[in-house]
Amino acid sequence: MPHGEAFLIEAELDGETRVCLLKDIQFGWLGNNPIHIDLYDLSNVEEIEVEVPIEFVGTPAGVEAGGTFEPVMHTLTIKAPPAKIPEKIVVDVSGLGLGEALHVRDITPPEGCMILDNPEETVAVVYEPEEEVIGEEETGAEETGETEATS
């Protein structure tokens, strides 16, 4: 189970089907076979807090201008009724320019969900391209070499 994914499953208990949240899986020492599964029964739960993965879509304008896109957060903590828990939260980053950041406050939560993370927290950044310092160092070395040669 990848980190941050909220898996809802149906489990039969005493002949009754219940919606459960898969909380944890323990695997055997070879890592292939599950030996224990923790479920959280959501039958009588109105709302639950879960981490949901973020899916970034689009190419940021800043990347097209030579910048680098860097995701900072990969999940968001949301509070929602079990039936409204999304598999992922899709975030369009095509509007991010050079040197701009996307914050939690900029994300519209899915219907019925509330994002619990700090609104000021940075979700992703488009860094400006780094200036090439290598060319300047080579120029400086050439000048030094010329000075030594004439001495």
UniProtKB/Swiss-Prot annotation:
Source organism phylogeny: Bacteria, Pseudomonadati, Aquificota, Aquificia, Aquificales
The segment annotated Disordered runs over 131-151
Q: What does this chain do? A: Not known. A homolog of ribosomal protein bL25, it is missing the N-terminal domain which binds 5S rRNA. In vitro does not bind 5S rRNA.
User: One GO MF term, please?
Assistant: structural constituent of ribosome
Q: Which CDD domains match?
A: Ribosomal_L25_TL5_CTC
Taxonomy, superkingdom = Bacteria
**GO cellular-component terms in the record?**
cytosolic large ribosomal subunit
Origin organism is Aquifex aeolicus (strain VF5)
Supply the gene name. Answer: ctc
In Swiss-Prot or TrEMBL terms, this protein is called General stress protein CTC
Cross-referenced InterPro entries: Ribosomal_bL25/Gln-tRNA_synth, Ribosomal_bL25_b-dom, Ribosomal_bL25_C, Ribosomal_bL25_long, Ribosomal_L25_dom, Ribosomal_uL5_bac-type
Q: Which GO biological-process labels does this protein carry?
A: translation
